[in-house]
Amino acid sequence: MKYGIALFPSKRIQDFANSYRKRYDSHYALIPPHLTLKEPFEADDQKIKEIVKELRKIAAETDVIPLKVTKFSSFYPTSNVIYLKVEPNETLERLHERLHSGILADKSEYVFVPHITIGRDLPNAEYADVYGQLRMQNVHFEETVDRFHLLYQLENGSWTVYETFLVGGKEQE
């Protein structure tokens, strides 16, 4: 089965992101606005049990996660992805590192750029027009997130939560 690890921002940020995603993101119906912490990976039932145990340990040792969204940005020319930029911070960086070491070790395909995608798979002309307008807008959200999620992919391509991990020394619900 295919799994991934992400955190979901507040409803306020999700609503803001979705106001763009419904028009510009081909994955709009597959997953809510999120910040990917670990790209999709394959794991069998036994392996996922080990991973869940490790994720509980990581969560217990992770502080609440500050999120500061500051602007629209893009991965152009690598891809026509438009996103909300999340300012890197020590807690987020450390969490990302821990999710790519030990039994979770892998070769990450990309450098970690914390972001929330709002547009993808746009033709070049549409990308240029949309990004040209968005990058002029002021964006500012600040909050803390107290959980991250192990997700799994359903047959229709959508993602759903397998387990939620509370950070900051909070007890699991």
Curated annotation (Swiss-Prot):
InterPro entries: 2H_phosphoesterase_YjcG-like (IPR050580), Cyclic_Pdiesterase (IPR009097), YjcG (IPR022932)
Active site positions: 34, 115
Enzyme class, broadest EC rank: hydrolase
Residue numbers covered by motif HXTX 2: 115-118
Alphabetical UniProt keywords: Hydrolase
Pfam families noted in UniProt: 2_5_RNA_ligase2 (PF13563)
Motif window: HXTX 1: 34-37
UniProt GO molecular function: hydrolase activity, acting on ester bonds
EC number(s) reported in the record: 3.1.-.-
The keyword Hydrolase is annotated on this UniProt entry: yes
NCBIfam families, sorted: PRK13679.1
Family: Belongs to the 2H phosphoesterase superfamily. YjcG family.
HAMAP family in UniProt: 2H_phosphoesterase_YjcG
Stated name of the protein: Putative phosphoesterase GWCH70_0799
Organism: Geobacillus sp. (strain WCH70)
